[in-house]
C-alpha cells in the first residue's frame, strides 16, 4: 500500500490539529486509522507501551514522528495517517523535538514496515523543503499533490 493511496482511500489526513500532549497527537493519527478499519483501538496503547519501554523511538527527524506498533498489536491491514499540528509538541527526544508532523503507520508484517513504509517516508522528506511544504498544506488535496510531485521527481 502506497502512502498516497492509503491517505486518499482512508481519508486519514488531519491538518493543523490541536493536541496538548504527544500522547494526544499520537491518538489523533491512530483514531484516523481505527475509523478506516486499518487498526484496532488497542494499537494506541501498544504504541504508548513501546514508548514507555524504549523511549520516543519513532521521532525520526527534527519535527517528524512516525508512530507505529507491531503487526500483532492490532493491525488489520497496512495503512498510514498523516497529522500536522498547529503547535509543535515535545516528545522527549534528545535531538528532534519539537514535533509537528506525524505519520502514523500500521504494517501487516516487518518486511512491509521496513521496505514500504519507511522508504516512502524517507522519499517524501529526502527534499528537506518538503517539511515546510507539508506544514503549509491546508487541504487534503494539497498534501496528495505534494506527494504526487515528490513521487514524480523520484
From Swiss-Prot:
It is found in: Cytoplasm. The modification Phosphohistidine is found at residue 68. Induction: Induced by L-ascorbate. Repressed by UlaR. The keyword Ion transport does not apply. The PTS EIIA type-2 domain is phosphorylated by phospho-HPr on a histidyl residue. Then, it transfers the phosphoryl group to the PTS EIIB type-2 domain. Keywords: Cytoplasm, Kinase, Phosphoprotein, Phosphotransferase system, Transferase, Transport. The active site is at 68 (tele-phosphohistidine intermediate). PROSITE patterns: PTS_EIIA_TYPE_2, PTS_EIIA_TYPE_2_HIS. The keyword Nucleus does not apply. GO terms for biological process: phosphoenolpyruvate-dependent sugar phosphotransferase system. PANTHER family: ASCORBATE-SPECIFIC PTS SYSTEM EIIA COMPONENT (PTHR36203:SF1). It comes from Shigella sonnei (strain Ss046). This is Ascorbate-specific PTS system EIIA component. One of its GO terms (cellular component) is cytoplasm. NCBIfam families: PRK10372.1. Its main location: cytoplasm. Residues 6-150 form the PTS EIIA type-2 domain. The phosphoenolpyruvate-dependent sugar phosphotransferase system (sugar PTS), a major carbohydrate active transport system, catalyzes the phosphorylation of incoming sugar substrates concomitantly with their translocation across the cell membrane. The enzyme II UlaABC PTS system is involved in ascorbate transport. GO terms for molecular function: kinase activity. InterPro entries: Ascorbate-PTS_EIIA_comp, PTrfase/Anion_transptr, PTS_EIIA_type-2_dom.
